[in-house]
């Protein structure tokens, strides 16, 4: 019986060690800046009350304006896609944001006054 328990605990420990470095894709509201995604396909939301620096990292990511907004916030957000086909949206009505597409085919949705770099497609 003790041998079975020891074998079971060893197997569990090996599985935990093997799965520990695996990062899962996330969907999250960024509550601090800078805010980082993972190397998977993430969805990140900016915070409406302060200047955001959001880094999507690898994967086909989406960066969007905040989940809620009472009125346009005069903040300057920096949104950075990473390697992958990212969708960066800064249509938060302030026109002061900077979007960097990164490697891959990136789509940037902006307001008048926002700036882009490395976006293969730019729209409003």
Question: What residues fall within each predicted segment?
Answer:
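Bacterial N-terminal signal peptides that target proteins for export
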Residues: 1-9
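C-terminal segment of classical bacterial N-terminal signal peptides
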Residues: 15-23
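N-terminal segments that cap or nucleate solenoid repeat domains
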Residues: 25-68
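Sequence contexts marking disulfide-bonded cysteines in secreted/extracellular proteins
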Residues: 29-36, 107-109, 118-120
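Glycine-centered beta-turn/loop sites at beta-strand termini
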Residues: 37, 46-48, 56, 65, ...
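Acidic glycine-/aspartate-rich tracts in secreted/extracellular proteins
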Residues: 94, 113-114
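Short, low-complexity, Pro/Ser/Thr/Gly-rich segments in the mature regions of secreted, periplasmic
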Residues: 114-124
């Amino acid at each position: 019986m003790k041998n079975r328990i020891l074998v079971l605990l060893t197997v569990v420990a090996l599985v935990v060690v093997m799965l520990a470095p695996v990062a899962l894709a996330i969907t999250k509201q960024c509550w601090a800046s800078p805010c980082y995604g993972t190397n998977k396909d993430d969805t990140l939301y900016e915070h409406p009350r302060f200047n955001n620096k959001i880094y999507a990292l690898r994967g086909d990511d989406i960066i969007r304006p905040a989940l809620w907004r009472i009125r346009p916030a005069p903040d300057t957000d920096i949104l950075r896609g990473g390697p992958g086909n990212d969708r960066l949206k800064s249509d938060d009505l302030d026109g002061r944001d900077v979007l960097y597409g990164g490697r891959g085919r990136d789509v940037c949705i902006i307001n008048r006054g926002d700036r882009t770099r490395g976006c293969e497609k730019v729209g409003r």
